[in-house]
Amino acid sequence: MSQQPSQHQERRPGIESEMRPRPQAQDPAYRGTGKLRDKVALITGGDSGIGRAVAIAFAREGANIAVVYLNEHNDAEETRRLVESEGPACLLIAGDIGDEAFCQEAVRQTVGELGRLDVLVNNAGEQHPQESIAQVSKEQLERTFRTNIFGQFFMTKAALPHLKEGSTIINTTSVTAYKGNPQLIDYAST
């Protein structure tokens, strides 16, 4: 597998459709076996990157998908198109996972429209590179923690009453948590 070249976008969140080359979100050789048939997965940050790849893979396994994303509408629509091309339904829910009320509403909408919730994937995260810790503002620090830590907590809290025995919560993390990065001090600590 080839490495993606380093790319930088000033806008946050970044827009996957503007990346060149485009990241590969699906493996054409992978064939689903129905392991998630009749299940529903809610994936935060499912509009792009790892979240999009998970949404497509889960759809290939038969799961209906709810994608929670901030405001990357075109990326989210592309994910919906890719998921629905596999057969299952794909619900798009735009909002800020750092807002507890939004997380409650996203879970309510998922259960209301897709009938249940079996898998929660806490994948959304944000990072804002800075040259030194002195450049990390209080607002940036709070925003990073609100998305990366509070968002995971709020979404899990909202989902738990709907998850039956045998359901799953998956929390993704970054290698940056283990290796560190001098330009991502706040992100690495989440």
Which residues does each predicted region cover?
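Catalytic loop of short-chain dehydrogenase/reductase
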Residues: 26, 32, 125-127, 168-190
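The beta1-alpha1 cofactor-binding region of Rossmann-like NAD(H)/NADP(H)-dependent oxidoreductases
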Residues: 73, 94-107, 138
